[in-house]
Regions:
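N-terminal cationic and glycine-rich segments that engage phosphates or anionic surfaces
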Residues: 1-103, 107-447
């Protein structure tokens, strides 16, 4: 597609240009909001605490909130409650018959499910905000602890999360790219310069050897190249169309291919898995020594870098890869039905149910490779990060999110440019047709 798309046409594509400016405007609003603090926070104590937690769980949480958690901004919870609510609603949609029926009702059913997701977001954000407010008080990071602080903190953080959810939905509908993914993407990219400065300052002070610095740089470059290769990898399923007759016209049969990505779920499984595993860490981060025996035990076994954490990370990535693919991004039954309606078929496979079973079999095998790729990209740098204490922004999850979102956004821009070029060609052909008719009418009659 890139070869057929002229980037010079960007200036003429008014709708695309407006979408890009709209997206940039909303993302700027998001970044400004990360610097607005929650009322009642002791800024000096918070900065001192976050300096000690920057390379640990604090750095991980800051990655998903664009640094807002480290500054205790109004967007400190980030978009994670919305993602968690989406996971729960999608799981329930597959298990509850009423929700499954809503899913099949088209646009109206989708709106109803989105409404349930918003209710779930408010509920989860309220729980997390209250837990975070209590943890801040326990960690002596509040100037005036008490009921008023907890209430104001909960209202502020829940309002910030709902505003981010609205920003993401508006970006998806009226801008470019997936709004939720772009919010996480911008948060990661905005914090990378500070992480790099911290990383190289550790090298200058001798805390990290030059060999480790070179190794991390090489690892990041190799990871980026590997992610780009795997995200562009496709399995093409051959589709045949028979010869058919409509009235007096005979249409010749043809063939095409159905492209299936090696990683159809994209970056969603990594985001889902990370958001769920970080729920207990969000509460325990600011609690100091008052964590409690239960939470201390959980963090001892399920903290980042621990064997059980890594094991559950892999299991969740594999699970969400299959779950998201077959429930959202690629539904074999719907694809088989569409092929049947278009008189298309897979050679050697009967249309309908047999085609759906074949597609499910093929995609399941592809997903085995795709989920293994996701787990490797997210897991191996995580192990190295735990051993070498490098900033989390150089980890596999952050690299995967940045590369995947960049590629998806560029692809959407190219699609809009290509559509604009086709619209221009159609308008030119229509104008040429009208001018020829006018010339024919004005031609003088022969005597």
């Amino acid at each position: 597609m890139a070869a057929n798309t002229s980037w010079a046409a960007l200036g003429k594509a008014t709708d695309l240009r407006n979408r890009i400016f709209f997206t940039l405007g909303l993302l700027i609003v998001y970044r400004l909001g990360t610097f607005i603090p929650v009322p009642g926070i002791d800024g000096a104590s918070l900065r001192e605490f976050m300096e000690g937690a920057a390379t640990g769980i604090g750095g991980i949480l800051s990655m998903f909130t664009g640094g807002a958690l480290g500054r205790m901004g109004i967007f400190a919870l980030g978009i994670m409650p919305y993602i968690s609510a989406s996971i729960i609603v999608q799981l329930l949609t597959s298990m509850v018959p009423k929700l499954e029926q809503l899913k099949k009702e088209g646009e109206q059913g989708r709106k109803k499910i989105n409404q349930y997701t918003r209710y779930g977001t408010v509920f989860l954000a309220t729980l997390q905000a209250y837990g975070l407010a209590a943890s801040l008080e326990a960690g002596d990071l509040v100037t005036d602890p008490g009921l008023f602080f907890r209430a104001s903190c909960v209202i502020t953080l829940v309002g910030g999360t709902m505003f981010l959810m609205w920003l993401g939905e508006q970006t998806t509908a009226r801008g470019i790219g997936n709004g939720i993914s772009l919010i996480i993407f911008v948060g990661i990219v905005a914090e990378i310069p500070a992480a790099m400065a911290q990383f190289f300052s550790q090298g200058r002070s001798g805390a990290i050897s030059p060999a480790v610095i070179i190794g991390v740089i090489v690892m990041v470059i190799v990871t980026i190249a590997f992610v780009v290769f795997m995200e562009r990898a496709l399995r093409k399923i051959h589709i045949q169309y028979p010869r058919r007759q409509a009235g007096m016209k005979v249409y010749e049969g043809g063939s095409s291919s159905l492209p299936v990505k090696v990683n159809p779920a994209g970056v969603i499984p990594a985001i889902f898995a990370s958001s769920l595993l970080l729920l207990p860490a969000t509460i325990s981060t600011f609690s100091g020594s008052d964590t409690g025996p239960v939470m201390s035990t959980i963090m001892a076994y399920f903290g980042p870098g621990q064997p059980l954490y890594l094991l559950f990370f892999v299991v969740m990535i594999v699970f969400f890869s299959y779950f998201y693919t077959f429930n959202v991004s690629f539904k074999p039954d719907e694809v088989a039905e569409n092929l049947k309606n278009q008189n298309g078929f897979v050679p050697g496979i009967r249309p309908g149910k047999k085609t759906a079973e074949y597609l499910e079999y093929v995609v399941s095998r592809i997903l085995a490779l795709g989920s293994a790729y996701l787990a490797a990209v997210c897991l191996l740098p995580e192990i190295l990060r735990a051993e070498l204490a490098v900033p989390f922004y150089f980890g596999g999850t952050s690299v995967l999110i940045v590369v995947s979102v960049t590629m998806d956004t560029i692809q959407q821009v190219q699609s809009h440019l290509l559509a604009h070029q086709y619209e221009g060609l159609i308008e030119k052909s229509q104008l040429c047709g009208k001018s020829k008719k006018r010339t024919t009418r004005k031609a003088p009659a022969r005597r």
